Amino acid sequence: YWQSIRQKTMNDKEYRDDDVVVIGGSDWKPGSENKNGSKDSRRWKMAAIFLAAALVMLGGFFLGKHLYYNHQFNRSRPDSEIISQLSEPMKGKAGISLEQQEAMGVRMKIYALTGLKAHFCDSVPDYTDSSVFFITRSSDYRIKDGKKQIIGDYIEDGKIISESLWRAGFMAIKEGNAQIGISRSRKIGKYITENQGSMFRQLALVAGGTTCEKQYILKGKVTRCAYARDLEGNLYFIETVNPETLYGFADALIEYGFVDAIYITGGTQPDRFYRQPDGTSHGQYIDDKPHELIVWTR
């Protein structure tokens, strides 16, 4: 009897002390779950590393593209300086002074603007009004589905009408004070919108005294026009006397001493309207299409 009890106790002890407990059947082996878990963990870690590397490469690509796009052309001054100068009225007595010059074989009519304020207009104003001194086109447009669409950024009195940064040249206006420049940043457009100003974009011809060949999408020879700025910050409107390529026109502007220039379509007018500082008017403004205009007043 005592022997049988002792045998039973030993059997119970053996069962309790046995540290191998079969749970998953005969195929289960100690440590197999940990090994599979480690493999899965390594796979997830490798996938995360590859994903992070891909995101870094993709981010670097888009950052590089953004920097190249925004800084493709030289700048004669930063956007912050242009914004600051938009608070400064144009110097001099209100009026337009005309002279003819030649550079690189290109004959040009150069209209110097002084003491004037710029305004957007969608129709030709009465330029017999003594307050009107000069009129030119501003942005371009296309007709799509029977509707007029302005090309490039176009902001009028703080209202965004069109958005596109590809055309790197621009004219910005705040309270009549105008500045031209070359930049694809949205910084100036944001400032103009917040301050109820106006802005349009055009093809860049000259940026920081260098050509902007990637913007020269208009081929052939026709008479050309542009707004340009010199080192002193004075603003001019230039038109060629004879048909020229954009390359030849830009080279002539640089040779003459302009540091920035933006293109204006429409070509030369046979006898363009302008008003001298003494109030004497000349010529007339002709435009048979509904272009957006810049009107300069005192």
Q: Residue spans of the language-model regions?
A:
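Structural motif
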Residues: 132-135, 169-170, 177-180, 203-204, ...
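Zymogen propeptides
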Residues: 11-164
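Short beta-strand-initiation
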Residues: 93, 106, 166-168, 200, ...
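Short, surface-exposed beta-strand/loop micro-motifs that present aromatic residues
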Residues: 98, 225-228
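Short, Lys/Arg-enriched N-terminal segments with co-localized hydrophobic residues
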Residues: 1-9
